[in-house]
Structures are given as C-alpha cells and as structure tokens.
Amino acid sequence: MKKLVTIIFLLNLILASANSMQPDVFVQSTVNRASEILSKNISREEKINGLKIIAKQTVDIIGVGFYSLGSARKNLNNNQKQKYFDLFEDYFLKSFSSRLSEYTNPKIEVQSKKFVNENYTIVNSVLVSTSDRPEVKIDWRIYTKNPDNPLIRDLIIEGLSLARTQKEEFTSILNSNDGDINALFRTLENFTKN
C-alpha cells in the first residue's frame, strides 16, 4: 500500500510538471499569438482588441500596476486602490496594444532562459531585424510563482525596463503634484480618453 501511494504521488508530480508551461515556451506561444493577430488583414481596431485579450491573459497587470505606483500605494485607501487599478488596467491595455498594433508580422525568436528564483525566470529573445528596423534584444521577466499560470511582469528592451520606466513616470507625476494621487488619476484618465 505504501508503494502504491508513493507511485501515485510521483505520477501526480510528473503530470503536474508536464502540465505547467515553461517560461520560454509561454513567451514563444504568446508572441506567436500576437504575431498571428498582427499578420491578419483586419482593421487596426480589431488588432488592438485582439492584443488586449492576449495581454489580459498573459500579463500580470495588477503586479505591474502595484510596482508602477511604488511606495505611494501605501497611502491609498481601498477605494483609491480600486480606482487606480481600474484606471491603470485601461491605461496599460491601451498603451500596450496601441504600440504593438503598428507592427506588421513581427518575428520574435526566443533564445534562452535564466532561472532567477522560484518566482522569476528571465526569457531572452530578439525581435528579428528587417530592412526597416534593426534587431532588438527583448528580455521578458516572467512571474512563475504559479507554474501553471506564468505571467509577464516586465519587458526589458535593449536594457531598458518598461516597468521601471513606468514607475519613474508615475513618481514624477506624483512628485510634481505634491503626492496628490488625483493628479495621477487625471493623467491616466486623459490618456485613455484620447
């Protein structure tokens, strides 16, 4: 009986690890899905909507939002936090999908991965050069705390962290408005309306 329990336990472990998606496979799959949308002969609006769906499924928008807000999040009440995350999600999805929708048939090749710790893996890739653009190095910071649901936490393009850049921008807005969170809310609202 003890051997049977051990065998069942080992089989469950093997099946669980087989079902969890490796970060590099996750990135390549995500890139392939986005590339398929961008390659279609559909309107820009349809491309943006398709990219938003992919982002909601693959990006840790809440985690990126918390990070982008920095220490200011400690001063917010629950209503302000909820308002921030609603605004941030709209802002993030519009910013992300609008930028990507300009690309036609981008080819990204995953090259390697580096295990950082049980929560993070860095996946290294390149946006393949074309006659119109040079090769671009893209590193993906993948949150792997739940191996069955890896999520993108950051993109580092040619050494520049998009999450860190976002955090610096939000900090600047807050600092230039005496820490008034409503100034950041207005900025996010204005961006999503335009």
Q: Would you name each region that the model predicts?
A:
Residues R73, D90-Y91, S129-T130, E158-L162:
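Solvent-exposed loop/turn segments at secondary-structure junctions
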Residues K94-V136, T187, F191-N194:
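Surface-exposed, charged secondary-structure patches
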Residues L4-I14:
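Sec-dependent N-terminal signal peptides
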Residues S20-L100:
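Early exported N-terminus immediately downstream of N-terminal targeting peptides
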Residues E135-K137, R141-R164:
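Short beta-strand edge/turn micro-motifs at domain boundaries
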Residues D154-N194:
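Low-complexity, intrinsically disordered terminal/linker segments enriched in charged
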Residues A16-A18:
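Hydrophobic membrane-targeting and insertion signals
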